[in-house]
Structure formats: C-alpha cells, structure tokens
Amino acid sequence: RAFCYVADTVTGIVEVMVNGENTEAYNLANETEPYMIRDVAQKLVDLYPEKGLKVVFSNPSDEVKKGYVSYKIVKLDTSKLESLGWSPKVELEEGMKRTVDSFILQRKK
C-alpha cells in the first residue's frame, strides 16, 4: 500500500490544478515506499518504544478472508503527475512523526 503525506498530496493536487490538462486523470501516490499495513503498525511501535506498544496479528477466518482481494500490491502509475514536476518529499517515517507530534500538540491545547 502506498502512503502519501498530506502536504505532498496537497502539493500534487495544486500542481494538477495549475499545470494539468483539463480532461486528464492523474494518479497521486508515494510509490517509492510501499508498505503493508502490518509494517506501518510495527514502524509506529518502533518509533515510540517508550509507549510500550505491541502489534498483535490474528489470522482471519475463511469468511473474513473472502472480503479481501487476492493480490498483494497494486502500484499506481504516477509518471503523468511527475512529468508536471511533482514528486513526494516526505517519507513515511517522517510523516508518521509529524502526524503524531501534531496530535500530541493538539491534546496539550
């Protein structure tokens, strides 16, 4: 799964609004760092060891599995947007830190 930091997303949208073609569709994603959800959860645990967090995985039942697609990775082609000059700037780990710091700051207010 591709994760894209909100500032990169906004920059991409503005890039399309200013320089994109009217009838074109543009894929916006940070495909440089695809992660599985479990890896994102573990990264969060690793970033904040002082919190004592733990990731627990469970194997879904056959009924639940039927609701999931069988393929693992779908990569969006972002080359059209990149040809306008856009590229993601914030890596997943940095974006997670910024997001958590923002939540902490908001809770203190």
Where are these regions (language model features)?
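C-terminal substrate-binding subdomain of Rossmann-fold SDR/epimerase-dehydratase oxidoreductases
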Residues: 1-109
